[in-house]
């Protein structure tokens, strides 16, 4: 199943990031873009998510320097754009993969594209990793650990359900029971023609 591969890649990315555990570390994609395109895209996608997860931790530091916070906010904006771009690349992969499929006359569209569901699966992998860290903390109270274990159990169940839904969606598309229709994300805040503040500075 597709999500078995995706979940394994996400876990590998998150484990690799935490070997050094800094947002400034270099990135190396272990999958070749030519011979392993979808693996390459999934690996890059989860790396972007993982770095941004830690950006979001840092910017919530109440003692953060305001200048550093502004710099970090712009990094988060850029990361969000990279994340969106990667989702669109992944959807492009599936559009190409299933281009030969003729949808049935009864085919329906899904509420989200495969790649946006995969985006949620990547974020879910990060939630599971960090919730598990809380469960394994030696300095935490028993009540904290118990509460986090309950949350972890829900997250693990959610991953099973989301993985099943994604695999079912891909199967439905392959069989012509559903069809893909992808909309470009109309990001406005980084566009100097659409953001009135940026437009006023031109």
Give a label for each model feature.
Residues 1-202:
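Anionic, Ser/Thr-rich low-complexity intrinsically disordered regions
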